[in-house]
Amino acid sequence: MTNSYALSPAIIAAVRPPASQDYLVAASLSGRKSINSSSSSIFVPISLSTSYGRSKCAFSISRKNPKSTIRCDIAVKSAASVDADADLSSSTSLETEEDEKAKEKIGARVRVTVPLKVYHVVRVPEVELMGMEGFIKDYVVLWKGKKISANLPFKVQFVKEIEGRGPVKFFTHLKEDEFELIDP
């Protein structure tokens, strides 16, 4: 985490060497950042962390209000929560095994075994899925690189013949117990 210190340009001018009149360069975790010193205050990001948590602090001095303020929020982990995090790593490996088994099903042919209706097929009021066959296109457990708990993790593609339109392709998300795998 990064923290910010706000310093007035007068303080910066008194402290910095004369060769750097235009910009103050501050190092941060994400790299180096140039900050214009002509603004009313300057924020210099820093990082504070301990073995049990992270601290987020802000120190500010402004021209309008000469009083300085320091504000800190600290997130601290107890020893029990550190142990719990270690236990979660073993359960995470079990989840990845389940995910790998489910991802092996991608591309498999399936048949819907429960009575389901969908209402999102264009120009068709409703479509009954019971007994329809389709293909598993995706197993949705990651969104933008983060693990999510999807209620309907299997994305299944169906093709239905509609009178006057020909075959219409649509997708539906299903649970694992709502379909059965068909042997090729």
Swiss-Prot record:
Gene Ontology biological process terms in this record: photosynthesis
GO MF term set: oxidoreductase activity
Entry GO CC: chloroplast
Superkingdom of source: Eukaryota
Residue range covered by the transit peptide: 1-71
Keywords: Chloroplast, Oxidoreductase, Plastid, Transit peptide
Pfam family, one: FeThRed_A
Subunit organization: Heterodimer of subunit A (variable subunit) and subunit B (catalytic subunit). Heterodimeric FTR forms a complex with ferredoxin and thioredoxin.
UniProt record similarity statement: Belongs to the ferredoxin thioredoxin reductase alpha subunit family.
Name of protein: Ferredoxin-thioredoxin reductase subunit A2, chloroplastic
